Design a protein with these regions (language model features):
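Subset of outer-membrane beta-barrel
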Residues: 10-321
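Sec-dependent N-terminal signal peptides
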Residues: 1-3
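Sec/Tat signal peptide C-region and signal peptidase I cleavage site
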Residues: 5-9
Length: 321
């Protein structure tokens, strides 16, 4: 149980609908949207068929100002498994979007900085250690254990930064988007190791991108990718979505993401006047699906992008789920 807990403690939570939590993948995405303000929420539950589920909830909001400065906030909470573990973070983001070039300055580079707090805690009463087991009577919850971690909670300052590129040209069929970011720049300490060992939380690096291809006036496809590395953990995801109108002011989005050696995640979204509802379901495909069947996950997301009255739409290449 301790080994599993250490793995959880040193890797950040993730979402299959990763663009539904934009500031969690890149502070440089603050204000990179087609409106003047945006709000996102995403809920994920995983492994509920085989154990106490991991539940992850994230919310974010960002605004655009006329001064080439964008501001954002994002909050996340994850309750993980049988150990009573909670991972929480909250960040404020400021981004500069004044680097523009091309015809009519409609290609944009945005730099973002994120500062906030990272909190982790667990309930040691929910752990079962080897020396609490009796060969005759079995597990004895009242028995003390020599395997005690030095701390059960921690709060630390945390920092991240990122850069993104978006294309707002309206007369080209293909528009690129992408970015790079790094998190835990100040290397917060891991509180759940022995006092004789100083170990920092590994930095997390993210590379993401793709393009939007307008096949015609009604149909657009968006291939995309995400690569994340944190310590020895690596996540690679690629996918494609199709967006088409099906009613007045309403869009339908359907697609699939593949997380290499882990899961396939089909998703479906419905958009109406700036509001987007999305749902996805991870079907495990890697070794975990063979050793522990029923380890699938489900996500539900909601996003709203709004504009001030009278301001034109900025057609930035920024996918929404």
């Amino acid at each position: 149980m301790v080994g599993q807990f250490k793995l959880i403690a040193q890797t950040d939570p993730h979402f299959s609908q990763f663009y539904a939590y934009p500031l969690g993948i890149n502070p440089g995405l603050a204000g990179v949207n087609e409106g003047d303000f945006r709000a996102n929420a995403v809920f994920r539950t995983q492994w509920s068929q085989v154990m106490t589920p991991y539940i992850t909830k994230g919310v974010s909001a960002d605004i655009v100002t006329p001064k080439n400065l964008n501001f954002g906030i994002n909050l996340l909470d994850q309750s993980a498994g049988d150990g009573g573990y909670h991972y929480q973070h909250g960040y404020l983001t400021i981004a500069y979007s004044g680097v523009r070039f091309g015809e009519d300055d409609n290609q944009q580079i945005t730099f973002g900085i994120q500062v906030g707090a990272l909190a982790r805690k667990f309930d040691p009463s929910k752990f079962q250690f080897g020396d609490q087991w009796n060969s005759i009577t079995g597990y004895e919850p009242t028995a003390s254990s020599a395997d005690q971690l030095p701390r059960t909670s921690s709060s630390d300052l945390d920092m991240g930064a990122g850069v993104s590129y978006a294309d707002a040209r309206d007369r080209v069929p293909v528009r690129l988007f992408g970015g790079f970011s790094a998190f835990h720049l100040n290397r917060p300490q891991d509180p759940f190791v022995t006092q004789s060992i100083a170990q920092s939380l590994p930095m997390r690096f993210v590379l993401h991108g793709g393009f939007q291809w307008a096949i015609n006036e009604r149909v657009a496809i968006t291939p995309q990718f995400l690569v994340m590395k944190q310590g020895t953990a690596m996540e690679q995801m690629a996918g494609i979505s199709v967006r088409t109108p099906f009613a007045a002011a309403a869009d339908l989005v359907a697609g699939v993401n593949y997380r290499f050696n882990d899961a396939v995640a089909p998703y479906l979204g419905f958009g109406f006047q700036g509001l987007v509802l999305g749902v996805s379901y991870d079907v495990a495909t890697g070794n975990l699906s063979k050793t522990a069947p029923g380890t699938s996950s489900m996500e539900v997301s909601i996003s709203y992008t709004g504009r001030k009255s009278g301001r034109p739409i900025r057609y930035l290449s920024c996918p929404r789920f």
